[in-house]
Amino acid sequence: MMPDHGELLYEGKAKRVFASTDPDRVLVEFKNDATAFNAQKKAQLDGKGRLNCQISARLFDLLEREGVPTHYCGLAGETWMLVRRVRIIPLEVVLRNIATGSLCRQTPIAEGTAIEPALLDLYYKDDSLGDPLLTEARVQLLGVADTAQLSAIEQLARRVNAVLLPFFDELDLQLVDFKLELGLASDGTLLLADEISPDTCRLWDRRNSNAEDRILDKDRFRKDLGGVMEAYGEVLKRVQGNCPNPRNCL
């Protein structure tokens, strides 16, 4: 069911953001669109929005219970959530626990190498530039964040990793790497925003040793492996087992 909402404020590749009756809250609708390679590859996957919304709600709740501040206020439907309005910082914050993907393409590090402590990478959130990898100096040159803000961003990201790693491990899921987006609330509080789902996390099934079959994330779409919705559904099934009842605002 669609909740009452105001005007469309923003539409991205995977979500729409609408005004709500509270100026400090917005409604987010998760779409069924699947995209990869900066939207060069696209598809409609029926049910994807619901799965990502339900997974994200439960993981935001988990993180809040562990003291990580997020924008999440509650579910507002199968594919909707109410969140705090934030000003998104134009950075994609990536934490890497296991070497794979672009890290292995850009360096001689072997696929599957454990990284401890996790590697934190910052990317400039700009599709027209291809989301380039940034140094700390470049982040400051762009005026995106100063030294103190970068320190706060790293602390929050590493706290998220410290909560999610053992949580997924209990579910026989290996948290390979993940992407976070952060934002500033009206009072200046740094909050975890966007979503946490198989669209933004690489998750490998410890119950399956096959290099392709173990993939339970967006790489199934990127690599044309098939079974995307089955993989996302399996992630929700396991997450639900430990986080059955997320907050909702219905």
UniProtKB/Swiss-Prot annotation:
Belongs to the SAICAR synthetase family. It comes from Synechococcus sp. (strain CC9605). Its EC number is 6.3.2.6. SUPFAM superfamilies: SAICAR synthase-like (SSF56104). It is an enzyme of class 6 (ligase). PROSITE patterns: SAICAR_SYNTHETASE_1 (PS01057). GO terms for biological process: 'de novo' IMP biosynthetic process; cobalamin biosynthetic process. NCBIfam families: purC (TIGR00081). Keywords: ATP-binding, Ligase, Nucleotide-binding, Purine biosynthesis. One of its GO terms (molecular function) is ATP binding. This is Phosphoribosylaminoimidazole-succinocarboxamide synthase. It catalyses: 5-amino-1-(5-phospho-D-ribosyl)imidazole-4-carboxylate + L-aspartate + ATP = (2S)-2-[5-amino-1-(5-phospho-beta-D-ribosyl)imidazole-4-carboxamido]succinate + ADP + phosphate + 2 H(+). InterPro entries: SAICAR_synt/ADE2_N (IPR028923), SAICAR_synt_PurC (IPR033934), SAICAR_synth (IPR001636), SAICAR_synthetase (IPR050089), SAICAR_synthetase_CS (IPR018236). Pathway: Purine metabolism; IMP biosynthesis via de novo pathway; 5-amino-1-(5-phospho-D-ribosyl)imidazole-4-carboxamide from 5-amino-1-(5-phospho-D-ribosyl)imidazole-4-carboxylate: step 1/2. Pfam families: SAICAR_synt.
